[in-house]
Amino acid sequence: MRILITEDEPLIALSLAMELEQAGHEVIGPAATIEASLRLARMHRVDLALLDIDLQQRGDGVIVAKRLREMDIPAVFVSGQDAVAHDNADLALGYIGKPYNPADIVRSVAVIDAVLHGKTPPPPPVPASLELFY
């Protein structure tokens, strides 16, 4: 999958990118702002966006999710902002809570990929940090 990462914490963004690339995914980004995320989404064919909610300490990830939805790009919130994620569940496929186990990200993406393509998700266990909103 081609996955857009929108995360303003550099170490988290790099760790996330590394895990996904090692699993064979193409990483777009990471982007740390609304503008950078949307620019990358327009420049590349993105299959999925992983979005931190609290970009720049302002909740800008919700704005990114709204714009990506208009572009028909599915998003998953990756954040410690549980209440905000649930309040905006209509904008995302789901939520991966921080902190998370890095291996759970790869497994979560496999589950999300199956859901997006109408396939049977990989066998359990589904990562505890993943919550689907559908």
Regions found by a protein language model. Name each.
Residues 7:
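Conserved acidic carboxylate
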Residues 10-29:
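Two-component/phosphorelay signaling modules centered on CheY-like receiver
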Residues 30-48:
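Acidic, metal-coordinating helix/loop segments flanking the phosphotransfer/catalytic sites
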Residues 52-69:
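Conserved phosphotransfer microenvironments
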Residues 76-78:
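Hydrophobic/aromatic residues positioned on beta-strands within the core alpha/beta folds
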Residues 98:
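A Lys-centered signature of the CheY-like receiver
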Residues 101-106:
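Conserved two-component signaling phosphotransfer/partner-docking surface
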Residues 116-134:
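CheY-like receiver
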